[in-house]
Amino acid sequence: MADVDKLNIDSIIQRLLEVRGSKPGKNVQLQENEIRGLCLKSREIFLSQPILLELEAPLKICGDIHGQYYDLLRLFEYGGFPPESNYLFLGDYVDRGKQSLETICLLLAYKIKYPENFFLLRGNHECASINRIYGFYDECKRRYNIKLWKTFTDCFNCLPIAAIVDEKIFCCHGGLSPDLQSMEQIRRIMRPTDVPDQGLLCDLLWSDPDKDVLGWGENDRGVSFTFGAEVVAKFLHKHDLDLICRAHQVVEDGYEFFAKRQLVTLFSAPNYCGEFDNAGAMMSVDETLMCSFQILKPAEKKKPNASRPVTPPRGIITKQAKK
Protein backbone atom coordinates (compact mmCIF):
# COMPACT_ATOMS: atom_id res chain seq x y z
CA MET A 1 0.00 0.00 0.00
CA ALA A 2 1.05 3.57 -0.65
CA ASP A 3 1.38 4.37 3.07
CA VAL A 4 3.99 1.62 3.43
CA ASP A 5 5.89 2.28 0.20
CA LYS A 6 6.73 5.88 1.01
CA LEU A 7 7.33 5.41 4.76
CA ASN A 8 10.38 7.42 5.85
CA ILE A 9 11.15 5.51 9.01
CA ASP A 10 14.32 7.46 9.87
CA SER A 11 12.47 10.76 9.69
CA ILE A 12 9.67 9.40 11.90
CA ILE A 13 12.14 8.15 14.55
CA GLN A 14 14.04 11.45 14.41
CA ARG A 15 10.88 13.49 15.04
CA LEU A 16 9.76 11.18 17.86
CA LEU A 17 13.16 11.57 19.54
CA GLU A 18 13.36 15.36 19.06
CA VAL A 19 11.42 15.92 22.30
CA ARG A 20 14.21 14.34 24.36
CA GLY A 21 15.15 16.90 26.97
CA SER A 22 11.86 18.78 26.54
CA LYS A 23 9.50 19.18 29.46
CA PRO A 24 7.53 15.90 29.73
CA GLY A 25 4.18 16.15 28.01
CA LYS A 26 5.24 17.79 24.74
CA ASN A 27 3.48 15.94 21.90
CA VAL A 28 4.87 14.75 18.57
CA GLN A 29 2.15 14.99 15.94
CA LEU A 30 3.05 12.62 13.11
CA GLN A 31 0.98 12.66 9.93
CA GLU A 32 -1.95 10.27 9.93
CA ASN A 33 -0.67 8.46 6.83
CA GLU A 34 2.70 7.94 8.56
CA ILE A 35 1.03 6.29 11.56
CA ARG A 36 -1.09 4.14 9.26
CA GLY A 37 2.11 3.13 7.47
CA LEU A 38 3.74 2.16 10.79
CA CYS A 39 0.75 -0.05 11.63
CA LEU A 40 0.64 -1.75 8.23
CA LYS A 41 4.38 -2.37 7.90
CA SER A 42 4.86 -3.61 11.48
CA ARG A 43 1.81 -5.87 11.12
CA GLU A 44 3.47 -7.43 8.09
CA ILE A 45 6.65 -8.05 10.12
CA PHE A 46 4.75 -9.48 13.12
CA LEU A 47 3.02 -11.99 10.83
CA SER A 48 6.33 -12.94 9.17
CA GLN A 49 7.80 -13.85 12.58
CA PRO A 50 6.58 -16.59 14.94
CA ILE A 51 3.78 -16.05 17.48
CA LEU A 52 6.14 -17.71 20.00
CA LEU A 53 9.45 -15.92 19.52
CA GLU A 54 12.74 -17.73 20.07
CA LEU A 55 15.27 -15.08 21.04
CA GLU A 56 18.93 -14.99 21.97
CA ALA A 57 20.65 -13.07 24.74
CA PRO A 58 22.00 -10.47 25.27
CA LEU A 59 18.83 -8.42 25.49
CA LYS A 60 16.93 -6.05 27.73
CA ILE A 61 13.38 -6.88 28.80
CA CYS A 62 10.84 -4.19 29.72
CA GLY A 63 7.40 -4.39 31.33
CA ASP A 64 4.33 -2.14 31.06
CA ILE A 65 4.80 1.37 29.62
CA HIS A 66 1.14 2.52 29.45
CA GLY A 67 1.58 5.68 27.41
CA GLN A 68 4.29 7.15 29.68
CA TYR A 69 6.33 8.29 26.69
CA TYR A 70 8.96 10.30 28.55
CA ASP A 71 9.64 7.32 30.80
CA LEU A 72 10.08 5.15 27.69
CA LEU A 73 12.68 7.66 26.47
CA ARG A 74 14.37 7.43 29.91
CA LEU A 75 14.50 3.64 29.57
CA PHE A 76 16.24 3.95 26.21
CA GLU A 77 18.63 6.60 27.54
CA TYR A 78 19.55 4.20 30.31
CA GLY A 79 19.65 0.95 28.34
CA GLY A 80 20.92 2.37 25.04
CA PHE A 81 18.81 3.47 22.09
CA PRO A 82 18.33 0.76 19.46
CA PRO A 83 20.36 -0.76 17.89
CA GLU A 84 22.86 -0.30 20.74
CA SER A 85 20.91 -2.90 22.76
CA ASN A 86 18.41 -5.59 21.80
CA TYR A 87 14.97 -5.23 23.40
CA LEU A 88 11.94 -7.31 24.28
CA PHE A 89 8.86 -5.48 25.55
CA LEU A 90 6.16 -7.45 27.36
CA GLY A 91 3.08 -5.47 26.26
CA ASP A 92 0.73 -2.78 27.58
CA TYR A 93 2.07 0.09 25.51
CA VAL A 94 -1.18 2.06 25.46
CA ASP A 95 -3.91 3.31 27.85
CA ARG A 96 -3.83 5.21 31.13
CA GLY A 97 -0.80 7.41 30.33
CA LYS A 98 -1.07 10.68 28.41
CA GLN A 99 0.97 9.76 25.31
CA SER A 100 -0.03 6.33 24.08
CA LEU A 101 0.36 7.47 20.46
CA GLU A 102 3.99 8.58 20.74
CA THR A 103 4.78 5.46 22.77
CA ILE A 104 3.34 2.93 20.33
CA CYS A 105 4.60 4.83 17.27
CA LEU A 106 8.22 4.84 18.49
CA LEU A 107 8.03 1.14 19.38
CA LEU A 108 6.53 0.20 15.99
CA ALA A 109 9.08 2.38 14.19
CA TYR A 110 11.96 0.59 15.96
CA LYS A 111 10.35 -2.76 15.11
CA ILE A 112 10.36 -1.81 11.43
CA LYS A 113 13.90 -0.37 11.54
CA TYR A 114 15.44 -3.28 13.50
CA PRO A 115 13.12 -6.27 12.97
CA GLU A 116 15.64 -8.87 14.22
CA ASN A 117 16.81 -6.91 17.27
CA PHE A 118 13.64 -5.34 18.64
CA PHE A 119 10.64 -7.35 19.79
CA LEU A 120 7.17 -6.50 21.09
CA LEU A 121 4.76 -8.92 22.77
CA ARG A 122 1.04 -8.38 23.16
CA GLY A 123 -0.37 -7.16 26.47
CA ASN A 124 -3.99 -7.31 27.60
CA HIS A 125 -4.34 -3.62 26.66
CA GLU A 126 -3.43 -4.35 23.03
CA CYS A 127 -7.04 -5.39 22.60
CA ALA A 128 -9.92 -3.27 21.26
CA SER A 129 -12.42 -4.01 24.06
CA ILE A 130 -9.88 -2.84 26.67
CA ASN A 131 -8.22 0.14 24.99
CA ARG A 132 -11.65 1.36 23.87
CA ILE A 133 -12.28 2.08 27.57
CA TYR A 134 -8.95 2.95 29.20
CA GLY A 135 -7.75 5.89 27.13
CA PHE A 136 -6.23 4.88 23.80
CA TYR A 137 -9.46 5.17 21.80
CA ASP A 138 -10.12 8.63 23.25
CA GLU A 139 -6.56 9.75 22.46
CA CYS A 140 -6.83 8.50 18.86
CA LYS A 141 -10.22 10.16 18.44
CA ARG A 142 -9.07 13.46 19.95
CA ARG A 143 -5.78 13.72 18.03
CA TYR A 144 -6.72 11.91 14.78
CA ASN A 145 -9.86 9.84 14.19
CA ILE A 146 -11.61 6.56 15.02
CA LYS A 147 -10.49 4.97 11.75
CA LEU A 148 -6.87 5.21 12.90
CA TRP A 149 -7.76 3.46 16.18
CA LYS A 150 -9.22 0.62 14.10
CA THR A 151 -5.97 0.43 12.11
CA PHE A 152 -4.08 -0.01 15.41
CA THR A 153 -6.52 -2.78 16.38
CA ASP A 154 -5.67 -4.66 13.16
CA CYS A 155 -1.98 -4.30 14.01
CA PHE A 156 -2.37 -5.37 17.67
CA ASN A 157 -4.30 -8.48 16.58
CA CYS A 158 -1.08 -9.71 14.94
CA LEU A 159 1.39 -9.18 17.80
CA PRO A 160 3.31 -12.23 19.07
CA ILE A 161 2.12 -13.66 22.39
CA ALA A 162 5.20 -15.12 24.10
CA ALA A 163 8.96 -15.48 23.78
CA ILE A 164 11.60 -17.91 24.98
CA VAL A 165 15.11 -16.55 25.52
CA ASP A 166 17.90 -19.08 24.87
CA GLU A 167 15.49 -21.95 25.62
CA LYS A 168 15.55 -20.98 29.32
CA ILE A 169 13.49 -17.84 30.04
CA PHE A 170 9.77 -17.90 29.20
CA CYS A 171 8.32 -14.42 28.65
CA CYS A 172 4.71 -13.29 28.32
CA HIS A 173 2.59 -10.39 29.54
CA GLY A 174 0.37 -12.04 32.14
CA GLY A 175 1.30 -15.56 33.13
CA LEU A 176 0.59 -19.25 32.90
CA SER A 177 -2.58 -21.07 31.85
CA PRO A 178 -4.15 -24.29 33.11
CA ASP A 179 -4.65 -25.11 29.41
CA LEU A 180 -0.93 -24.82 28.56
CA GLN A 181 0.57 -28.29 28.26
CA SER A 182 2.82 -27.84 25.23
CA MET A 183 4.52 -24.87 23.56
CA GLU A 184 3.04 -26.18 20.33
CA GLN A 185 -0.37 -24.94 21.54
CA ILE A 186 0.94 -21.36 21.47
CA ARG A 187 2.50 -21.89 18.05
CA ARG A 188 -0.86 -23.09 16.71
CA ILE A 189 -2.72 -19.87 17.59
CA MET A 190 -3.67 -18.24 14.30
CA ARG A 191 -3.34 -14.51 13.70
CA PRO A 192 -4.94 -12.03 13.31
CA THR A 193 -6.95 -12.74 16.44
CA ASP A 194 -8.81 -10.80 19.09
CA VAL A 195 -8.18 -11.76 22.73
CA PRO A 196 -10.91 -14.21 23.81
CA ASP A 197 -12.66 -13.99 27.19
CA GLN A 198 -11.14 -17.27 28.35
CA GLY A 199 -8.67 -19.97 27.37
CA LEU A 200 -4.96 -20.13 26.62
CA LEU A 201 -4.48 -16.79 24.83
CA CYS A 202 -6.56 -14.95 27.43
CA ASP A 203 -4.58 -16.49 30.31
CA LEU A 204 -1.15 -15.71 28.82
CA LEU A 205 -2.18 -12.02 28.76
CA TRP A 206 -4.25 -11.83 31.97
CA SER A 207 -3.23 -14.32 34.70
CA ASP A 208 -1.31 -13.41 37.87
CA PRO A 209 0.88 -15.26 40.38
CA ASP A 210 -0.48 -15.40 43.95
CA LYS A 211 1.56 -16.56 46.94
CA ASP A 212 -1.61 -17.47 48.86
CA VAL A 213 -2.93 -19.87 46.22
CA LEU A 214 -2.26 -23.57 45.89
CA GLY A 215 -2.64 -24.56 42.25
CA TRP A 216 -5.11 -22.33 40.42
CA GLY A 217 -7.37 -19.70 41.93
CA GLU A 218 -9.97 -17.09 41.01
CA ASN A 219 -8.59 -13.79 39.75
CA ASP A 220 -9.86 -10.55 41.32
CA ARG A 221 -9.70 -8.97 37.87
CA GLY A 222 -12.73 -11.06 36.94
CA VAL A 223 -10.72 -12.53 34.06
CA SER A 224 -8.49 -15.61 33.90
CA PHE A 225 -6.86 -17.16 36.99
CA THR A 226 -4.20 -16.81 39.63
CA PHE A 227 -1.53 -19.48 40.04
CA GLY A 228 0.65 -20.57 42.93
CA ALA A 229 4.36 -21.28 43.33
CA GLU A 230 3.99 -25.01 42.70
CA VAL A 231 2.39 -24.35 39.30
CA VAL A 232 5.47 -22.29 38.39
CA ALA A 233 7.92 -24.96 39.60
CA LYS A 234 6.13 -27.74 37.70
CA PHE A 235 5.94 -25.68 34.50
CA LEU A 236 9.66 -24.85 34.58
CA HIS A 237 10.63 -28.45 35.29
CA LYS A 238 8.39 -29.86 32.56
CA HIS A 239 9.74 -27.51 29.88
CA ASP A 240 13.36 -27.43 31.12
CA LEU A 241 13.20 -23.68 31.76
CA ASP A 242 14.90 -21.54 34.44
CA LEU A 243 12.66 -18.49 34.78
CA ILE A 244 9.30 -16.96 33.88
CA CYS A 245 9.47 -13.25 33.11
CA ARG A 246 6.15 -11.36 33.02
CA ALA A 247 4.66 -7.90 33.58
CA HIS A 248 0.98 -6.93 34.14
CA GLN A 249 1.20 -5.84 37.80
CA VAL A 250 2.59 -2.68 39.41
CA VAL A 251 5.43 -3.61 41.77
CA GLU A 252 7.06 -1.11 44.11
CA ASP A 253 10.68 -1.64 43.08
CA GLY A 254 9.94 -2.11 39.36
CA TYR A 255 10.72 -5.81 39.66
CA GLU A 256 9.63 -8.48 42.13
CA PHE A 257 10.45 -12.17 42.46
CA PHE A 258 7.99 -14.97 43.21
CA ALA A 259 8.21 -18.72 43.87
CA LYS A 260 11.82 -18.83 45.13
CA ARG A 261 12.87 -16.51 42.33
CA GLN A 262 11.55 -18.77 39.60
CA LEU A 263 9.28 -15.97 38.32
CA VAL A 264 9.92 -12.25 38.04
CA THR A 265 7.40 -9.45 37.47
CA LEU A 266 8.71 -6.40 35.59
CA PHE A 267 6.94 -3.04 35.50
CA SER A 268 8.59 -0.22 33.58
CA ALA A 269 6.30 2.79 34.20
CA PRO A 270 7.60 4.68 37.27
CA ASN A 271 5.09 6.76 39.28
CA TYR A 272 2.41 4.79 37.45
CA CYS A 273 -0.46 7.09 36.44
CA GLY A 274 0.94 9.69 38.84
CA GLU A 275 -0.88 7.74 41.58
CA PHE A 276 1.78 5.22 42.66
CA ASP A 277 5.20 5.75 44.17
CA ASN A 278 6.67 2.78 42.30
CA ALA A 279 10.01 2.55 40.53
CA GLY A 280 10.25 1.21 36.98
CA ALA A 281 12.68 -1.54 36.02
CA MET A 282 14.27 -3.17 33.03
CA MET A 283 15.97 -6.58 33.16
CA SER A 284 19.24 -7.06 31.30
CA VAL A 285 20.04 -10.63 30.29
CA ASP A 286 23.67 -11.19 29.30
CA GLU A 287 25.14 -13.97 27.13
CA THR A 288 25.53 -16.24 30.16
CA LEU A 289 21.86 -15.59 31.12
CA MET A 290 22.90 -13.59 34.15
CA CYS A 291 20.06 -11.19 34.89
CA SER A 292 20.54 -7.72 36.33
CA PHE A 293 18.05 -4.95 36.93
CA GLN A 294 18.24 -1.33 35.90
CA ILE A 295 15.96 0.85 37.97
CA LEU A 296 14.18 4.07 37.05
CA LYS A 297 13.47 5.65 40.41
CA PRO A 298 10.14 7.36 40.97
CA ALA A 299 10.17 11.15 40.98
CA GLU A 300 9.37 11.46 44.69
CA LYS A 301 11.62 10.11 47.38
CA LYS A 302 10.59 6.69 48.58
CA LYS A 303 9.43 6.22 52.14
CA PRO A 304 12.44 5.64 54.43
CA ASN A 305 11.53 2.04 55.26
CA ALA A 306 10.84 0.84 51.71
CA SER A 307 11.47 -2.87 51.33
CA ARG A 308 15.04 -4.07 50.80
CA PRO A 309 16.14 -5.36 47.38
CA VAL A 310 15.15 -8.97 46.86
CA THR A 311 17.76 -11.70 47.40
CA PRO A 312 19.30 -12.88 44.11
CA PRO A 313 18.04 -16.19 42.72
CA ARG A 314 20.09 -19.35 42.58
CA GLY A 315 21.42 -20.12 39.10
CA ILE A 316 20.41 -16.71 37.80
CA ILE A 317 22.66 -14.20 39.53
CA THR A 318 21.33 -10.67 39.83
CA LYS A 319 22.82 -7.33 40.53
CA GLN A 320 21.08 -4.02 40.94
CA ALA A 321 21.94 -0.86 39.08
CA LYS A 322 20.26 2.28 40.37
CA LYS A 323 19.76 5.53 38.57
From Swiss-Prot:
Residues 301-323 are annotated as: Disordered. GO terms for cellular component: cleavage furrow; cytoplasm; kinetochore; midbody; mitochondrion; nuclear speck; nucleolus; nucleus. Its EC number is 3.1.3.16. GO terms for molecular function: metal ion binding; protein serine/threonine phosphatase activity. InterPro entries: Calcineurin-like_PHP_ApaH, Metallo-depent_PP-like, PP1_catalytic_subunit, Ser/Thr-sp_prot-phosphatase, STPPase_N. It catalyses: O-phospho-L-seryl-[protein] + H2O = L-seryl-[protein] + phosphate; O-phospho-L-threonyl-[protein] + H2O = L-threonyl-[protein] + phosphate. The active site is at residue 125. Mn(2+) 2 binds at residues 92, 124, 173, 248. The keyword DNA-binding does not apply. SUPFAM superfamilies: Metallo-dependent phosphatases. Protein phosphatase that associates with over 200 regulatory proteins to form highly specific holoenzymes which dephosphorylate hundreds of biological targets. Protein phosphatase 1 (PP1) is essential for cell division, and participates in the regulation of glycogen metabolism, muscle contractility and protein synthesis. Promotes nuclear envelope reassembly by targeting nuclear membrane vesicles to chromatin at the end of mitosis. Acts by dephosphorylating membrane proteins such as lamin B receptor (lbr) to regulate the binding of membrane proteins to chromatin. This is Serine/threonine-protein phosphatase PP1-gamma catalytic subunit B. It comes from Xenopus laevis (African clawed frog). The gene is ppp1cc-b.
